């Protein structure tokens, strides 16, 4: 049995875990639970992050933030190599027709940012689950969902998201910048056409005046 010093992690389920490259740091995020570990006395939605240091055999709570969102997290989370951010799939498990949303968590303070579009998932049975993976060779995130219904049917789906994932605001901002750039290109093109047409008309008018000019006759003394 391993003995860890430091902060206590209360009993919970529906929590997520991320591991660093050398497997010395384990991050545990969120879930549902309570101090006693007895579901009969109720459960709380947890919004906290713990760091388990296997080398130091210690547990440290990095933060615990209040949240208005009642969300649980998929078991597998993705930790960035610099251990500054964690990517996690969160969803309201109490909804039968629920949805998964990818979030980026800041390890230092717990700031959450929604990324990409949501993924629909039917969560009728407790065995229904979702998982998140990252392929460093293709730079893609993979989400798999396994759905069970009351008739015993199973449906497995896979979704792919190219890295780096961006937020909806960033997509809108990029679209606005692209539209502005296109608008300026059309304006500059219009100015260029006007200058070209004006130059051609000026040259033609000048040549016409030169042709119509009558030379004065010189007087002979």
Predicted regions and their residues:
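Short, conserved, GDST-rich strand-edge loop motifs in beta-rich repeat architectures
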Residues: 28-45, 89-99, 147-155
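C-terminal single-pass membrane-anchor helix
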Residues: 172-221
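Conserved blade-ending motifs and adjacent loop-strand segments that build the rim/top face
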Residues: 58-78, 108-136, 172-182
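Short glycine/serine/proline-enriched coil/turn segments at secondary-structure junctions
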Residues: 7-10, 39, 68-70, 94-96, ...
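Conserved short beta-strand element of beta-propeller blades
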Residues: 4-29, 42-44, 49, 70-87, ...
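Blade-level signature of beta-propeller repeat domains, shared across WD40, Kelch, NHL, RCC1
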Residues: 126-188
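Loop/turn-rich, solvent-exposed surfaces of beta-rich toroidal or solenoidal domains
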Residues: 66-109, 187-193
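Beta-propeller blade signature
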Residues: 41-57, 99-111, 154-175
């Amino acid at each position: 049995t391993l003995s860890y010093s430091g902060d206590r992690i209360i009993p919970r389920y529906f929590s997520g875990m991320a591991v660093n490259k050398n497997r010395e740091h384990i991050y545990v995020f969120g879930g549902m639970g309570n101090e006693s570990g007895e579901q009969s006395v109720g459960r709380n939605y947890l919004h906290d992050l713990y760091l388990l240091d296997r080398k130091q055999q210690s547990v440290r709570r990095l933060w615990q933030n209040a949240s208005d969102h009642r969300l649980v997290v998929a078991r597998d989370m993705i930790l960035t190599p610099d251990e500054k951010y964690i990517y996690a799939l969160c969803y309201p498990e109490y909804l039968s027709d629920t949805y998964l949303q990818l979030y980026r968590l800041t390890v230092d303070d717990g700031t959450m940012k929604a990324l990409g579009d949501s993924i629909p998932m039917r969560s009728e049975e407790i065995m229904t689950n979702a998982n998140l993976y990252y392929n460093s060779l293709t730079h893609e995130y993979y989400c798999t969902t396994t759905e069970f219904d009351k008739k015993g049917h199973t449906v497995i789906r896979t979704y792919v998201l190219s890295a780096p994932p961006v937020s909806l605001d960033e997509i809108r901002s990029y679209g606005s910048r692209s539209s502005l750039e296109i608008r300026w290109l059309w304006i500059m093109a219009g100015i260029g056409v006007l200058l070209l047409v004006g130059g051609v008309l000026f040259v033609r008018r000048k040549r016409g005046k030169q042709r119509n000019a009558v030379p004065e006759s010189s007087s002979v003394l």
